[in-house]
C-alpha cells in the first residue's frame, strides 16, 4: 500500500509541483485527455480528486504534503447526499399515472432537513437500510439483478423477490427510471438540470444477447436492418441525468 501510494501519488505530485504549488488539470468534458460521460469533472496531473482518505497512515502521509498559506486554514465542504436529492426532485416532477402521492411526503422531509433517503425507502419498502441503499444506488447506476444478488449475497431468485417488493412499495423510483429510459430510447437525448445534452447515439441488436454497440449505419449493416436494432445503454439514462445534474 505504501509503495502504491508512493508511485501513484507522491511521484506524480512531485513531478507536477511548481514553486511549491500544484496546478492540476480539470476535465469538464470527455475527451482523450480525460473527463466523464455525465459531465462531472475529472482531474489529472495529478488527480487531486483521488487523494487517499481512508487509510489513516497513508492519508496522513499524502494529505500532509498540502498546507495552507501562512495565517490561513483549510476548509472542507461537501454536498450532503446530493444524488438522492436530485432523484427525489425528479420523482416529484412526475405527472399523471407516473406520479405517486408518497413522493410528496419524502419532499416534505427534505424541506424539514430530516431526510435520510435510504432509511426513508427502507421504511416504506419494509426492508433493511443496507438493502434499500444498495437498490437505490443500483437504480441510479443501472445495476442488474445478478450484480445486486452478488453484492447482497443473495440468490438471483431472492434478488428478484427483493426488487419486486421494492418496486411495489416504492413505485415512484421505478417510474422515474422507466420514464428516463423511455425518453433516451425515443429521442436519443436527455437534458440535465442546466441543459447539458447526454446523447445515446450508439446502437445494438434488439436481442438480449450481448453484442458490441455501434453507430447507427454500422449497426444496421452488422445486425440486419433498422428494425432489428435499438439504442444502446439507455438503462444508464437515469444515472446520466442524476450525475450530470449533480
Q: What name fits each language-model region?
A:
Residues 1-246:
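Conserved catalytic core of nucleotide polymerization and phosphodiester-bond processing enzymes
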Amino acid at each position: 500500500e505504501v509503495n502504491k501510494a508512493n508511485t501513484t501519488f507522491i511521484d506524480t505530485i512531485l513531478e507536477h509541483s511548481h514553486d511549491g504549488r500544484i496546478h492540476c488539470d480539470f476535465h469538464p468534458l470527455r475527451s482523450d485527455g480525460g473527463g466523464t460521460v455525465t459531465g462531472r469533472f475529472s482531474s489529472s496531473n495529478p488527480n487531486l480528486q483521488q487523494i487517499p482518505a481512508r487509510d489513516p497512515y497513508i492519508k496522513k502521509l499524502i494529505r500532509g504534503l498540502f498546507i495552507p498559506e501562512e495565517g490561513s486554514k483549510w476548509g472542507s465542504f461537501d454536498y450532503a447526499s446530493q444524488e438522492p436529492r436530485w432523484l427525489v426532485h425528479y420523482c416529484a416532477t412526475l405527472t399523471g399515472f407516473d406520479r405517486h402521492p408518497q413522493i410528496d411526503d419524502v419532499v416534505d422531509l427534505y424541506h424539514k432537513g430530516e431526510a435520510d433517503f435510504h432509511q426513508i425507502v427502507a421504511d416504506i419498502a419494509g426492508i433493511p437500510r443496507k438493502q434499500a441503499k444498495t437498490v437505490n444506488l443500483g437504480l441510479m447506476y443501472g445495476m442488474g439483478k445478478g450484480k445486486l444478488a452478488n453484492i447482497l449475497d443473495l440468490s438471483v431468485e431472492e434478488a428478484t423477490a427483493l426488487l419486486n417488493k421494492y418496486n411495489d412499495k416504492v413505485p415512484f423510483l421505478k417510474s422515474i427510471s422507466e420514464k428516463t429510459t423511455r425518453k433516451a430510447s425515443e429521442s436519443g437525448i436527455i437534458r440535465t438540470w442546466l441543459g447539458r445534452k447526454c446523447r445515446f447515439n450508439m446502437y445494438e441488436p434488439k436481442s438480449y444477447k450481448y453484442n458490441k454497440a455501434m453507430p447507427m449505419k454500422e449497426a444496421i449493416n452488422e445486425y440486419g436492418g433498422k428494425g432489428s436494432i435499438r439504442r444502446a445503454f439507455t438503462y444508464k439514462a437515469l444515472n446520466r441525468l442524476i450525475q450530470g445534474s449533480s
